[in-house]
Amino acid sequence: IRDSSVTGVQTCALPIWVILLLGFFLGVIITISEPDLQVLAAQVPSVPNMVLILSVAAGVGAFLVVALLRILFGIALAPLLVVFYGVIFVIARFVPDNFLAVAFDSGGVTTGPMTVPFIMALGVGISAIRNDKHAENDSFGLVALCSIGPVLAVLLLGLVYPAQGSYVAADVPEAFNSVELGRLFLSEIPYYLKEIAGSLLPIVFFFGIFQLVSIQLHKKTLIKICVGLLYTYVGLVLFLTGANVGFIPAGNYLGTVMASLPCPWILVPVGMVIGYFIVKAEPAVYVLMKQVEELTDGEISGKAMQISLSVGVAASVGLSMLRVLTGIPIMYFLIPGYAIALFLTLFVPKIFTAIAFDSGGVASGPMTATFLLPLAQGACTAVGGDVVKDAFGVVAMVAMTPLITLQVLGLIYKIKSNKKEEMAEQPLLQAEDVFAGYADDAIIEL
């Protein structure tokens, strides 16, 4: 399902309007199937769950259409980002504070293990339609644009629905031995078997229609996709069971304990260490790293990218813990952060801008939603803060900082490339200086 060759086959023979219509419906279906979206919907009591889910899904679908148009017509990514983020911050000015953190969190939450691989593969497949030298570079940036849709959708809902700042703390299950712990996990597996099956069913149905009507893949390719689907199903069930049963209570408890210490400021450095390492556990990060290495022929190594992401996430978690302890409004961080990120787009190679804004959505995946957010919620409850305003926003912060760190990596890469070019030109200039005093027809004795 996530094979870019499949998307390439299904798009190359279709007119543009059909590609865009299918892109919209694919974006909606994939987003509805994203498990983390259900978690987000439960955190916004003033908006009905289905209204929020459908609005966010429509936002992703609409911006997936924008992203596909950008690829097909070779439109630059940076101006689009400046315009759309400008619109976001203008609308945010009129939205109640209780909606702001959740709105910006939604952009990171919806680009998770279901959405990212499919959207990136779709970008690679559609960019193959173009034959120019910039086509591969333009295959990045889909996740970046699709992350904008949910933020706008929730902000617009904030203009319609009244703000309600309620938060219900997660129950921390108790297990006194390994047998009880095993039962606790086993009791939750059936729920996630059903939830993930429901999430994958629309994708399988959509793919089945295309297989019968249009693409008609070979048996070997079909078996490969089915095996991949089985791996995806089993992996997501195990991952989400462990994350929701183990990580959410653990994060909440750890945050409560640390914030209750005589020196609650220990939250900031501990949060930074956790943030540095937790990004390595994000499933979608490895999908992005692999695709970046392949499309850049190893010029951007996975290791350098992972370090940049880890540093960015560490900084964002540290700032989030600072917000929890001090109650600083989230916009005091988001506005300067996005301003710096958008300013860097003027100097950084376009490929790095696209990868950086993609990585923001990728880094803020299920690990962030199931551990870092509960960590902040537990700490905020312990210090007596407003959980809706101060704890929410961790996902948004995690999605923002990689935009800066990866573009700084791109700036370093650009400087090094320029130095290499200058060093390569020096021998030629020296040779020209040696022969500068001779006429064109002069005889040079060796």
Short names for language-model regions:
Residues 94-102, 154-162, 239-246, 318-319, ...:
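Hydrophobic alpha-helical transmembrane segments in multi-pass integral membrane proteins
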Residues 15-87, 264-345:
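Helix-loop-helix junctions within the multi-pass membrane cores of secondary transporters/permeases
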Residues 64-75, 99-102, 124-138, 213-219, ...:
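Alpha-helical transmembrane segments
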Residues 16-23, 83-94, 113-119, 145-154, ...:
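Small-residue-rich segments of transmembrane alpha-helices in multi-pass membrane proteins
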Residues 64, 87-95, 117-125, 333-355, ...:
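Hydrophobic alpha-helical segments of multi-pass membrane transport proteins
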